[in-house]
Amino acid sequence: MSLADFDQLMMRRALDLARLGTGYARPNPLVGCVITHEGRIIGEGWHRQYGGPHAEVNAVAAVTEQHLLPRSRAYVTLEPCSHFGKTPPCADLLIDKGVAEVVVCNLDPNPLVAGRGLQKLRDAGIQVETGVLEAAGRWLNRRFFTVQEKQRPYVVLKWAETADGYLAGPYFQTVPISGELARVAVHQWRTEEQAI
């Protein structure tokens, strides 16, 4: 397997991990991290809940053989943060642990980060690669990107009406209109969205 194929495989795993934060990490983005050493996963994590440790912190903590970190490669779905917020900067953690390479899916559009995390890594001598599965990462965090880039919420509109154009039953009685699949989809959206 080529390095490019391996990078995509590991980033897919990181994206899968990031999805586990759905409904818990908001309003923060969904972030996953996989750490490898010589082609083997040695640690992985995701941002489990708002205010809690970020994906990189959880992935580093999961590494049982910490001595391997200086020769490791970290795959992160979003640029490691570079500022103090509810948690310390993840870029600093990766630098302190001596991670050799960092592969990033998307740059963080948040003005507090916006390239500063990657610059910190590069200034520390860490090799950085960006844009691996970038479109998949943007789709996963479309809500976060919309808020950061457009300063507005991500909007989902669900519309259902009867065959004759009504939105409810007679006398505004609640009746199912769109069926079971739509009901399941709406409940999924309610888990993912920040407002209804």
Feature-to-residue mapping (PLM):
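Zinc-dependent deaminase
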Residues: M1-T22, I41, Q66, G85-I196
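Glycine/alanine-rich phosphate-binding loops at beta-alpha junctions
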Residues: S2-P70, L78
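Short beta-strand segments
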Residues: G32-T36, V76-T77, C105, K158-A160
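Local cysteine-cluster metal-coordination motifs and their immediate loop/turn environment
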Residues: W46, P53-H54, A74-L93
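Short beta->alpha junction loops/turns
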Residues: R48, G52, E79-P80, L107-N110, ...
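Protease-associated
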Residues: N58, A62, S72, V155-E161
